[in-house]
Structures are given as C-alpha cells and as structure tokens.
A protein has these predicted regions:
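The feature captures the conserved acid-bearing segment of alpha/beta-hydrolase catalytic domains
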Residues: 167-247
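Primarily recognizes the serine-hydrolase "nucleophile elbow" in alpha/beta-hydrolase
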Residues: 129-194
Length: 309
C-alpha cells in the first residue's frame, strides 16, 4: 500500500530551472516541525529566506511569504527558490520551509499535523512562529503562502492554524487522488478556514494524481460549468481556479508539473526546465508572475490576461 500511495504526489529533482534574477542573500534558520516518529513537534527542520531590497521597500519589517515544497522536494531546490526570489522582489520576507515530506503514506491524518507544524500561531517554535519573531517580519501585515502538490495541501490548510494567513496560491492539488481513489476531505471548503475569495488553485488538465474539475471545485469553493478551464470569484478579486490545457504549455502535456518543460510527455514526471508560458515574463492567468502579483495583494486584486488565457 505504501508503494502505491507514494505515487500520489512524488516530485523529482528539478534541473536547470530558468529562474529569475536572484535578489539578495539567502539566510537560514530552524524550527520544530511535526515528527511522525514521536507524534510531536520536535523534529528540527530548516528554513531559508530572503529579504526585500531595502532601497526599494525600506528597512522593514515586511509581510511574510511561506513556500511549502512538494513530496521529496527539498526546500532550497530551484523551484522553491524561484518562488522565494519572486516574492522577495515583491516586498515580502520570503521563506521556504523543509518538513517531513518523505513519508510514503499521505492522508489527511498526516497532512494536518504537518501543516500545523509549519503554521501554528500558538507555538513560537513553528516555522511561522520563528519567522514572525524576526525583527524583519511584521506578521500583523499578513502571511501569504504557496506550495506545489503536497506543499499545496500545506498552504490550503495554513489558515486553519494561523489567522494571519491572508491568501494562498496552490498548485497541483485537489481533494481526490485519481491513481489510488483516495479522498482528502480535510481540504474541502467546509473544512478550511481561508475564505474562498482568498484562494487560487492552478492544476494541469492531464494531472494523473489530482486532475479533474469537481475535486478542484471542492477545495476552491467556486463552481463553474462543466468543461470550464478557469473559474473566478464573482466579486472580481481574482481568486478562483484554473485548469491548464495540454495545448498551453510548450510540451503539449499539462501533467502534474505542467509548469515544467517535461521531456517525453510523461504526466508523472517533474524533471525539466521551467515552461516559458509559466515563467516570467509570461502573463497568462495560469502563469507564475500574475499569480504571485495577486498573492502580493493578499488576494484582493488580479490583473487578468488580455488574451483571456
């Protein structure tokens, strides 16, 4: 059973991601993460973070961005640092956190304590607690979060453990694993605290793990006509969901890692280059830049693509 469940959200090592210019020095610290061996929050894990350019954004303190990597993804791999550099460039103390993401069996009972370990507002040794204690952080301005695959689950659950989490951008996740017919009710909208108009999720149409419109709608809270590729909040704040079509990325296959130029059209693969329609300066509604711009407004304003895509 473990070997089957491992396939749900396994992310391989990213190679040669065409990252944006790195801004600033990467600093490190540690926090106490959830330890499945003791069922307690006593597993020392690492945090890496960058500060904004003080010439542009002032001396701080700054609002906080937190990125959670996917299964088997390391917290400082090129994908994680792409997010960190981009959010530091938007005026955030931008951090990426390691957690126990190597365990094969992944269910709500394992996801929820991992998320609590990262975001818990009541524990000074959580990742959020450590970051918010920094003289460079002002968490009263707000925390925003993002993550891919299992990391997307962490981000969606974040506000359940920390009311300072104001907006979330999640990638490649839903409430149902197609390959093993496993449901994740913990991330369904009735069970999450984050308002639906502060959540954006972008998935690939050919994702063999978390694909499908209904499982995505269950997490988002927004429902559109069957066959829709995008669905946005009626209040115009830019929250909602997007399903990237196979024709929209360079490789012609929008799998679990649609944001990478994956060799061989393998929907399971997460090894490759950053897809040019996802990386900056691409400005589609599913591209990285516009979604991080939306996140930087704490989920209140989106600049929609003039192409409609």
């Amino acid at each position: 059973m473990k070997s089957v469940l491992w396939l749900i959200v396994s992310l391989s090592v990213y190679c040669s991601l065409q990252a944006a210019e790195r801004r600033g020095t990467t600093l490190t610290t540690t926090y106490q993460s959830y330890n499945p061996n003791t069922d307690n929050f006593n597993l020392t894990q690492s945090i890496a973070y960058q500060l904004p350019n003080s010439s542009r954004f002032g001396p701080g303190p700054y609002p906080v961005f937190m990125y959670a990597p996917g299964t088997y993804e390391t917290y400082t791999d090129p994908l994680a640092m792409e997010f960190v550099a981009a959010m530091a460039a938007r005026g955030f103390l931008a951090a990426t956190v390691q957690y126990d993401n190597n365990e094969a069996v992944q269910t709500c009972s394992t996801y929820t304590p991992r998320a609590q370990g990262i975001y818990d507002v009541n524990r000074s040794t959580s990742a959020a607690g450590v970051l918010c204690s920094s003289p460079y952080a002002n968490c009263t301005k707000g925390i925003v979060s993002s993550g891919v695959s299992q990391g997307g689950f962490m981000a969606v659950l974040a506000a359940n453990y920390n009311p300072k989490v104001k907006a979330v951008f999640a990638l490649s996740m839903s409430d149902y694993a197609l390959n093993v017919s496993l449901s994740y009710p913990c991330v369904d909208k009735p069970n999450t605290v984050l308002p639906e108009n502060r959540l954006t999720i972008v998935n690939g149409a050919a994702d063999p793990f978390f694909g499908g419109q209904q499982p995505l709608e269950n997490v988002s809270g927004y429902t559109c006509a069957n066959g829709s590729s995008q669905c946005w909040s009626p209040d115009g704040d830019g929250a909602g969901w997007y399903i990237v079509q196979n024709s929209q990325n360079k490789n012609g296959y929008a799998g679990h890692c649609y944001f990478l130029d994956v060799a061989g059209n393998d929907p399971n693969s997460c090894v490759g280059l950053g897809d040019p329609s996802w990386l900056p300066p691409a400005d589609y509604n599913w591209s990285l830049g516009p979604n991080l711009d939306w996140l930087a407004t704490f989920g209140t304003k989106r600049n929609f693509s003039s192409s409609g895509q």
